[in-house]
């Protein structure tokens, strides 16, 4: 197989792309006869080691047979005649390259890896494994075998699905020993919570936060290893990323990896696969809950409980949503935004709307098959709001040691919260507690309440509505 990476026009671009090429292609190094980097200058110095990449990349570089090929005229595409694949680093040239390919009837495939302009450049890099002769079919057979040997024996009645939303904080003291816990994503960082929950399945799927070349992803993978040591369990990954994890994770984890296939491209209206044990694949969606957790739960159990899938108000569209700091890697967010600039240029409300569409339809599909879905923590997501239970809230009840409990429902009151709370919290000569219930405010009410709670831990308790949204539900929660 002969591949090229084009164009590289500056030293800084070379230093930026070399780590990506090594990270994604190192697992396939034995399949390449040629791996050329087409540079428009003469390379006279060593590459810089950049801190925001996983440092194992630079140790593996010496094992890659990469050649620098001078190409001073970046619009001279004649080198394409000798290649099978070209990895395009500048998507502005995609049209010109495609015209040249068509003109000369070339069979070469263009793989678009411009991480500054494309949101899914890294997914295209990851999916290159599907091009390797026979490897793709081998991985699908591994997937089928492991689903049957590792996933199928875990069938039980109750399944608990954990997300990483802020409201997951209400749920960590509950006893889940009567069912199977499926945890996900950055929950790996909190070993105390992992030991408490004892998940039997851990699911990960993100192309940049989990399978990418950044130091953020490196920290995630190190935590994944540490999590596995204290809690050995099945780890479900996309078949797309299986070569990454089977190459870079320790050998003692490989037998526990279960790759599951999802088809790309996929239309939103295509059906859900809610029996993985029969179909050995899932529908492509944009979130771990709908991609892996709910399909696994529907395949293994009858009662499905959801925790920590908070969603967000539509008005707060500067990011996907908020996370519980206890289960989130927060010290390297700036790093991953540098390494994957294009990924963060997505329109977050469009992503959110699609997520709502997938949840609504997947929940309906699962329930049509006789399964029950119960949401155990407050959520802005309408299908989860409708299925809320206060089962978790019961475990938060304490013997009343106050003479008076004041229940205060709140909705979009950011202008008045400080004034009202100061009045209520400064009352004298009475033993009381103040319980404030946020009814899914779309302004900054909840953030202000949580800040006040930290300053008044003995007297103020803040919850979101554990019932259907509305005044009655908020009062009932209190």
Identify what each model region corresponds to.
Residues 428-430, 454-459:
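Short helix-capping segments at alpha-helix termini
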Residues 20-21, 413-426:
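Short, well-formed alpha-helical segments that are part of the catalytic scaffolds
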Residues 465-478:
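Glycine-rich, basic loop-to-helix element that forms the pyrophosphate-binding segment
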Residues 402-405, 433:
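Cell-envelope/extracellular polymer assembly enzymes that use nucleotide-activated donors
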Residues 2-399:
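Metal-ion/cofactor- or nucleotide/acyl-coenzyme-handling active-site neighborhoods
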Residues 11-13, 408-419, 440:
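Active-site beta-to-alpha loop of glycosyltransferases that engages the nucleotide-sugar donor
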Residues 438-447:
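A conserved acidic beta->alpha catalytic loop
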């Amino acid at each position: 197989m002969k591949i090229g990476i084009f164009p590289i026009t500056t030293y800084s671009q070379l230093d930026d792309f070399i780590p990506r090429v090594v990270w994604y292609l190192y697992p396939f190094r034995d399949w390449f006869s040629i791996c050329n980097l087409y540079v428009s200058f003469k390379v006279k110095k060593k590459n810089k080691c950049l801190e925001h990449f996983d440092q194992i990349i630079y140790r593996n570089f010496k094992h890659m047979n990469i050649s620098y090929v001078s190409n001073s005229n970046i619009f001279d595409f004649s080198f394409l005649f000798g290649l099978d694949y070209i990895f395009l680093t500048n998507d502005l040239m995609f049209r010109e390259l495609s015209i040249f390919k068509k003109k000369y009837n070339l069979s070469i495939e263009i793989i678009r890896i411009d991480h500054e302009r494309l949101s899914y450049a890294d997914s295209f890099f990851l999916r290159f494994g599907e091009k390797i002769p026979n490897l793709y079919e081998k991985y699908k057979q591994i997937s089928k075998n492991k689903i049957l040997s590792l996933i199928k024996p875990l069938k039980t009645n109750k399944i608990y699905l954990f997300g990483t939303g802020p409201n997951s904080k209400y749920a960590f003291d509950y006893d889940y020993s009567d069912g199977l816990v499926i945890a996900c994503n950055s929950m790996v960082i909190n070993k105390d919570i992992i030991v408490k929950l004892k998940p039997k399945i851990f699911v990960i799927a993100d192309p940049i936060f989990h399978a990418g070349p950044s130091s953020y992803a490196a920290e995630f993978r190190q935590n994944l290893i540490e999590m596995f040591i204290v809690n050995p369990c099945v780890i479900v990954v996309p078949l797309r990323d299986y070569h990454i994890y089977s190459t870079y994770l320790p050998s003692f984890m490989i037998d526990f990896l279960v790759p599951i296939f999802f088809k790309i491209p996929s239309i939103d209206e295509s059906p859900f696969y809610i029996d993985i044990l029969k179909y050995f694949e899932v529908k492509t969606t944009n979130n771990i809950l709908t991609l892996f957790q709910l399909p696994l739960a529907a395949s293994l159990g009858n009662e499905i409980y959801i925790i920590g899938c908070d969603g967000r108000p539509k008005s707060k569209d500067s990011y996907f949503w908020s996370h519980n700091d206890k289960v989130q890697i927060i010290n390297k967010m700036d790093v991953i935004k540098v390494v994957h600039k294009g990924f963060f240029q997505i329109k977050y409300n469009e992503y959110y709307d699609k997520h709502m569409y997938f949840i609504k339809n997947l929940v309906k599909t699962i329930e049509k098959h006789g399964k029950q879905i119960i949401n155990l923590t407050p959520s802005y997501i309408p299908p989860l709001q409708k299925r809320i239970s206060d089962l978790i809230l019961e475990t938060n009840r304490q013997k009343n040691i106050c003479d008076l409990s004041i229940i205060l429902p709140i909705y979009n009151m950011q202008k008045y919260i400080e004034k009202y709370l100061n009045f209520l919290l400064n009352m004298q000569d009475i033993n009381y507690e103040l319980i404030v219930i946020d009814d899914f405010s779309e302004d900054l009410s909840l953030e202000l309440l949580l800040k006040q709670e930290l300053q008044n831990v003995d007297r103020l308790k803040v919850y979101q509505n554990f019932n259907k949204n509305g005044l009655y539900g908020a009062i009932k929660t209190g």
